[in-house]
Amino acid sequence: PEATERLIELAEQIKGQKTADGKAIKNEEWRTRTLSERLNFALIKGNTEYLEADLAEALTVYASPVEIIEGPLMQGMDKVGTLFGEGKMFLPQVVKSAKAMKAAVAILQPEIEKHNAGTGENIQRPKVVLATAKGDVHDIGKNIVSIVLTCNNFDVIDLGVMVDNQKIVAAAKAHQADLIGVSGLITPSLSEMEALCELLQKEQLRIPLIVGGATTSTVHTAVKLAPRYDYGVIQGGDASRTAGIMKRLLSDRSSYLAQVKAEQEKIRGQYYHKQDRLLPYTEAQALAPVFDRESYRLPASFGEHNLLGKNMDLQDLIAKIDWTPFFHFWGFKGKFPEIIHQHEEADRTYQAALEMLGTVIAGNEFEASIVVNFFDAYAEDDEIVLDNGHRLPMLRQQKAGQECLSLSDYICPKAYGTSTIGLFALKVADKQGGCDCHDFSHLLRESLCARLTEALAEWMQEQLSEGLSLIRPAFGYSACPDHSLKKDVFDLLDAPSKIGVSLTTSYAIYPTTSLCGMLIAHPAARYFSIGKIGADQLTDYCTKRAITLEEEKRLLGL
């Protein structure tokens, strides 16, 4: 242990010194260490330069290639997992470590096959099946979990995105999985997770299920998922926490699940005891804010021209990038720019991002496209009615004590005439395909696409605001949680043919780094959360949408 600590300390001390002509000086002191320490160091630092030579030497020292993997290589990866869990290593470093481990195994693979053929031995690692729920195309979080699990000595079977529940169960059986992990970003994924729990219960697989993604929560897991499956359903949280949960399930399943189930029982009790008091829908409508007629008057220039932009210049977006969420994605806590002065690895990641931006701009490797159409519109019975007759129903806050807001409040009431509303769809897509989704460069590109998408939305708002108070609520988010409205807007804008975006059966947008929503101008316009709604409003909304109650519950995650 003391030698390993010295090695970690040495790794942290290497600062990339430079000569007078600006060239980096290689610090090769670690090459004087023992073979085991050198292999540990290579994995911790993600350094593959000497792997072939060191592994060739290891084959002459260790009895078998299996011993090399289970010895110095896994010792290094165990340390990576520990340091990441303690917040002493960050995701960029973990990704590079995982890549180095993959390279080491690839180098040893021919010898492993020879050894296995002669002895019948195999390396046994705990197996976890990972998948993104059916209808959901967001996989970046799942890919990060996969990387972290690999660093924690798991054998990961990644089924990809939009995976049917039957396929998940079949894979768990075929691979004799120890654990199953399912992620989802959009609310319809919650109903898929509920159905998966019921299927697992029916099949009696007795394999714990870990769920994750932005749409999941400890409350939903306790109230809607856990009662459907007797053998453990846990909400994972971030990659580090998910890895910790899975390790606990392997080492101490019975007592850990008993603890989790007791906590979930408590959460269910609190949930049912503290049911929010909801106003009757008609009363919530009566309490809607009232604005004077003049507040809906907009300059004639607002919405005068529609906007269609293809292959836009990314240079226009760089200044509008919000870097703080970028660093949060990579596991750094704090705000930009202070964060790059607080963490050396954050600064390295930032420099890599800037270099990558330069590369993709020079090579025209990202496509930024946008379509915005404006419509005269009025509000009637919580619906936004466009000048072509199309109606977009909006939900209204119904919880007692809330302001009973609806986005339709910011649109001119029919009695006053009309105001102008914009509908938009936009994307920033990576033209480069066929990349290793676990590679640092790929994750960096994907995280930059996400930031540039938000920057494009910011640019759009700035270009079109005419100095007005303007909001851009996106469908599927808290003020307008119905994802199916994206289909209405895609049809109204002809977005698929104009900018090359599409929808899944659960209304997730592809490419994933895309947005769809409304542009609403009003002095009082602001973002808010609808929260819980009553059966009366839900029934009314289903009638307006001409959709079944069951389907709307799925869309809203109810």
Language-model features: locations:
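Short acidic-hydrophobic, aromatic-tinged amphipathic segments that line or gate anion-handling sites
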Residues: 232-238
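Cofactor-cradling patches in redox/metallo enzymes
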Residues: 1, 143-152, 158-228
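Small-residue-enriched alpha-helical segments and adjacent helix-cap loops
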Residues: 346-536, 544-547, 555
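Active-site loops and adjacent core secondary-structure elements that bind or stabilize anionic groups
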Residues: 1-71, 75-81, 240-442
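Gly-rich Lys/Arg/Thr-decorated short loops/hinges at beta-loop-alpha junctions or inter-strand turns
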Residues: 31-36, 81-89, 124-129, 144-154, ...
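Conserved phosphate/anionic-ligand binding catalytic regions in large, soluble enzymes, centered on
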Residues: 72-76, 80-97, 137-142, 148, ...
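Conserved helix-loop functional segments at active or binding sites
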Residues: 57, 79-86, 103-118, 151-159, ...
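Long, charged amphipathic helices and adjacent flexible linkers at domain junctions
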Residues: 1-41, 90-131
